[in-house]
Amino acid sequence: MGLLDGKVALITGGARGMGAAHVRLFLEEGARVVFGDVLDDEGKALAEETGAVYVRHDVTSAREWERAVALATDLYGKLDVLVNNAGILKYRRIHEMSPADFDQVIGVNLKGSWLGIKSVIDPMKAAGRGAVVNISSIEGFIGAEGLSAYSASKFGLRGITKSAARELARHKIRVNSVHPGAIDTAMVMNPDLVNEVDAETFVKSMVIKRFAKPVEVSHVVAFLASDRASYCTGSEFTVDGGLLTGAGY
């Protein structure tokens, strides 16, 4: 019996990287999965490979949220789980970053997740319960040079998580956040970021001295989506190899 048997899940940003790992693990654990992205070629390929259902989904669009949620409920009759995984990173120092770039990061990472929570309330109420997992970051706890917009969005997502947890508990909807650290994905390996960071020194500063595989985050996400996390809401789960334990000296 899988951890997520009988669950219907909607996962954003699911075409590659950590999102694709979530899609694969949720399927392995028995969930039926609809996943969205704006990367159509990769999304369609993953759907063909796994049997999950792909939908083009710009998370900044309320209309596209309505469409994605409707697809899941029309196909499977309910919606139990939302994983707000979609996110973008732009490495720019404050004096180099345009207002448009700042707005884009906040729009995808913060507003997109808020729209997602708003969009799933009614179907989760109808189902009698639900679970939302917001993918934040260790940058939701600390600042980093060149990541002002990204850090702001991830700090903000912590606040949305806690507010939503308080609002939605009466409907048996749990809301938690996951905070990955150094994960081996295309976004983390962004050339602008990699060129600014000495990877060897960075790894030496870790307690667990390696980058994580995306599926190592997915296992935490799946737990929070499952009934085994029935008493967890408004909580923050770090998957960071000990990066936030201290300064490393």
What are the language-model segments listed below?
Residues L3-V34:
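Canonical Rossmann dinucleotide-binding motif of NAD(H)/NADP(H)-dependent dehydrogenases/reductases
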Residues R93-I94, D101-I106, F202:
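Substrate-binding pocket helix/loop in short-chain dehydrogenase/reductase
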Residues I117, S153, T161:
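Active-site helix of classical SDR
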Residues D122, R166-R170, S230:
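Alpha-helical segment proximal to the catalytic Tyr-Lys
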Residues S137:
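Residue(s) in the substrate-gating loop at a strand-loop-helix junction
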Residues I142, A222, T233-Y249:
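Short C-terminal tail/terminal secondary-structure segment
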Residues R170, A182-S205, G246-Y249:
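A glycine/serine/threonine-rich, flexible loop-to-helix segment
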